[in-house]
């Protein structure tokens, strides 16, 4: 019985999400995520030759189970081996339902573990295709850190904006009391009208400039305007208070997960008295009843080659709460 392992990171919500034009002029849903190092999912897949069933632990990780099943068929065909069953085990620390890509992290770690069990190196594009097939829309976590405009429902890159987002310090917080959001209950994206696409394309151009110039102020502007547009789909009662705090403490802007309650205030790492600004921000959040979570820097993770790199052995650890449907439950993010 050969076991394979895989890992995947998560993110801290989106910098930009909306409807954009692809190279053929089609309207396509796309997003740019804010990478977050330190949290993620670790998967281990054990092949069971002579069996057909595929199981997963915890049992409620159905998207990861589907992804493992699809990856099994692909890897078996790639290696010209007979199809078999196996067991997938997942451990991780990504809070569920806050908009941090927990399901995508599970799915991508599962695909990587199956590929490792077969000794197959899947290209990131293949991992993206399997991830979208398993969960209908996937975050670009398989692409490990570049600043990308990614079509989450098609599993392809619309634009490579550059090696990394501009440097920024992010003071994380949780809106809605840290309650999880049932993403399946969110309204389906409405067809983009003639005013939506130009607005998002304008922000896309500004983000392109921000990445090229490593301009954190322009990054903060794009993130704030994208979050403001998203208020029409998933309104946050604290949004006005959040932007008000940003203005008072000298933040560059705010970013809000577009399918959850995690949010952040962005600061210039070179700002005068940065520590004082961060402390003032956390005090202002507490006074407003918005729990602060952790503070981190936007730093790129390892770059991806044309094929998936090895992701090492899975480490045992305390799993995140196994049930994704705890809508009223507050989730605490570990300090980084």
Language model segments and positions:
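ATP-binding N-lobe of GHMP and related small-molecule kinases
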Residues: 1-98, 308, 321-323, 327-336
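Short beta-strand scaffold segments in enzyme catalytic cores
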Residues: 12-18, 41-45, 139-142, 147-150, ...
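Gly/Ser-rich catalytic serine loop of serine hydrolases
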Residues: 93-105, 139
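DPxDG-like acidic metal-binding loop motif
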Residues: 100-124
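ATP-dependent small-molecule kinase catalytic core of the GHMP/sugar-kinase superfamily
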Residues: 123-249, 268-291, 295-336
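Small/polar glycine-rich anion-binding or flexible loop at a beta-alpha turn
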Residues: 239-240, 257-265
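A short linear hydrophobic-aromatic micro-motif
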Residues: 250-255
